[in-house]
Swiss-Prot record:
Transmembrane parts of this sequence: none
Transcription is among the record's keywords: no
Lineage of producing organism: Bacteria, Bacillati, Bacillota, Bacilli, Bacillales
Alphabetical list of PANTHER family matching this protein: PROTEIN MALY
Gene ablation phenotype (knockout): No visible phenotype.
Protein name: Cystathionine beta-lyase PatB
Pathway: Amino-acid biosynthesis; L-methionine biosynthesis via de novo pathway; L-homocysteine from L-cystathionine: step 1/1
The species this protein was found in: Bacillus subtilis (strain 168)
Gene: patB
Length: 387
């Protein structure tokens, strides 16, 4: 795969490239914000989709045992996690699954714990369903985030807390939570009867030899209180095909989740999503290995550029994913000023840190899922914005 090739995405109804005027008021800025990559999907996926297209019939379609076997094989081979096929259900996306989980495992007025700064839809899916957010803010230690377990225990002990949403690896920072962290977290949730929804959508994109630990893999007790959200969308750049696998080992919890899907008129996956998830998880490994090597090269380039050209910008080097969490607070700019500098002076679009809740002030998220040349262009634009 030639990851250096710069693919043209303008005019393809791309949110990242074609909505910049509507969303940011600029049309001449380089988009490095929303979390999809500028790479073509693996040939294994595109060829499978062509074959499905050539069949020419697109009636009602449902994932079957073959689809579940592909998910199980992937989890076993990539993460050492033996998943029971019966525990798998499917959703059009992880955000949809978050909403379904909130409806299934909480009541209106309940509190849901999240760890800011964190992925924006966590807030939306809780609040739009009439539940309340309770923050367990992450601590910054030695250039990375850490969990405040003392505060977490206090929050989980509140009887109105019924759900905890974990982001592992963490978005926006790329922090991969350690086995020890997950064990402590899981024991607290068990003790207080709190269900854990673990968003593990970035878990296939582990960098620099880091290994992902699925929360539900740690014990049967943890599995029984867990809902794991996985998907090939970030891994293989197929978010537009809308396919995710939701792993719920406990039968009663799985039934509640399925009832939420049905109540909202959501059934199965579309025909191309089924084909894509099977091809991705059964044939996508070699392509992913190449991608990870390339993303590591991009991360190293960003780190080197920032250290020499913009030493006041602090980069949280990620354990996983193609996203970079950048701290611009040393410049003393307000978040609005920082955003306007990027848009108007630098002509580059980053994701504002304030979108991720408390603790995101002064930060912006950079998407390095692009060619090295595009990344270098973006870094030069950031420098221009701050000059």
């Amino acid at each position: 795969m030639n990851f250096d090739k710069r693919e043209e995405r303008l005019g393809t109804q791309s949110v990242k490239w074609d909505k910049t005027g509507e969303l940011f008021g600029v049309t001449d800025a380089l988009p490095m914000w929303v979390a999809d990559m500028d790479f073509r999907a693996p040939e294994a996926i595109t060829e499978a989709l062509k074959e499905r297209l050539d069949h020419g019939i697109f009636g009602y379609t449902t994932p079957d045992q073959k689809t579940k076997d592909a998910v199980c094989g992937w989890m076993q081979n990539r993460h050492g996690w033996k998943v029971n096929p019966e525990s798998i259900t499917f959703s059009p996306g992880v955000v949809t699954a978050l909403s379904m989980a909130v409806q299934a495992f909480t009541e209106p007025g309940d509190q849901v714990v999240v760890q800011p700064p964190v992925y924006t839809p966590f807030y939306h899916m809780v609040e739009k369903n009439g539940r309340h957010i309770l923050h367990n803010p992450l601590l910054e230690k030695d250039g990375a985030y850490a969990i405040d377990f003392e505060d977490l225990e206090t929050k989980l002990s509140d009887p109105s807390v019924t759900l905890f949403i974990l982001c592992n690896p963490h978005n926006p920072s790329g922090r991969s939570w350690s086995r020890e962290d997950l064990l402590k977290l899981g024991e607290l949730c068990l003790e207080h009867g709190v269900t854990v929804v673990s968003d593990e959508i970035h878990s296939d994109l582990m960098l620099y030899g880091h290994k992902h630990t699925p929360f539900a893999s740690l014990s049967d007790d943890f599995a029984d209180i867990s809902v794991t959200c996985a998907a090939p969308s970030k891994t293989f750049n197929i978010a537009g095909l809308q396919a995710s696998a939701i792993i719920i080992p406990d039968r009663l919890k799985r039934a509640k989740f399925s009832a939420s899907l049905q109540r909202n008129g959501l059934g199965g996956l579309n025909a191309f999503a089924v084909t894509a998830i099977e091809a991705a998880y059964s044939k996508g490994g070699p392509w992913l290995d190449e991608l990870i090597t390339y993303i590591e090269k991009n991360m190293n380039e960003a780190e080197a550029f920032l250290s020499t050209e913009l030493p006041k910008v602090k980069m949280m080097k990620p354990d996983a994913s193609y996203l970079i969490w950048l701290d611009f607070s040393a410049y003393g700019l307000s978040d609005a000023e920082l955003q306007q500098r990027m848009l108007k002076k630098g002509k580059v679009i980053l994701e504002p840190g304030t979108k991720y809740g408390p603790g995101g002030e002064g930060f912006m998220r950079l998407n390095a899922g692009c060619s090295l040349a595009t990344l270098q262009d973006g870094l030069r634009r950031i420098k221009a914005a701050l000059s």
